[in-house]
A protein has these predicted regions:
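Active-site neighborhoods and metal-handling regions in enzymes and metal-associated proteins
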Residues: 1-174
Length: 174
């Protein structure tokens, strides 16, 4: 549904990184943002992982570098808080605030510089926009991404993204 983003180490500090000539090596941080189209509808998912002997794109990661692990855990918790905040009747900016406020409380507010999410449907970016300015009231059946991130220029970036659908009692991860 879009050109994938594949970024290694410091290149992952760019939210919409372009390819570099750097080769992936054991111990590198790898960020992959990709999606497919099925019956005209888009999908979108981002994972950040350590490329080592235990390489996987699951949400549980074990970085040997303590700072990478700390940032990863903050982003993972921010995403969980945002997903837990999803409920019909809430405004999009309330979902954004759940992730953004947590990241800011950990001291990385300035390193999270994009919206928390966007609608996903026939187009990869559509309403509702899950951002500070998002005034859209969530309704059952709305589908959007939840993708907080922390980006440390010259070092690395971490983003975790899932697409959710608003259900009567909260979010369902697709």
């Amino acid at each position: 549904s879009f050109s994938p983003i594949v970024a290694i180490n410091e290149n992952a500090a760019k939210a919409h990184a372009l390819p570099s000539k750097k080769r992936l090596r054991r111990g590198d941080l790898l960020l992959l943002d990709a999606g497919v189209k099925f019956n005209r509808y888009c999908s979108d998912r981002t994972r950040t992982a350590c490329f080592d002997e235990n390489f996987n794109f699951g949400k549980e990661q074990n970085f040997k570098n303590a700072k990478r692990q700390e940032i990863y855990e903050i982003v993972k918790e921010a995403q969980a808080l945002a997903i837990a905040a999803v409920m019909p009747g809430k405004k999009a900016n309330e979902i954004d605030a759940a992730a953004r406020d947590f990241i800011a409380a950990q001291g990385y507010g300035e390193a999270f510089f994009h919206s928390t999410g966007h609608g996903v449907g026939v187009d990869i970016h559509e309403l509702p926009f899950i951002s500070k300015r998002g005034e859209v009231v969530l309704k059952e059946g709305m589908v959007f991404s939840v993708e907080p991130g922390i980006y440390l220029p010259g070092e690395f970036g971490v983003r975790i993204e899932d697409v959710v659908v608003v259900r009567e009692n909260g979010a369902e991860i697709l």
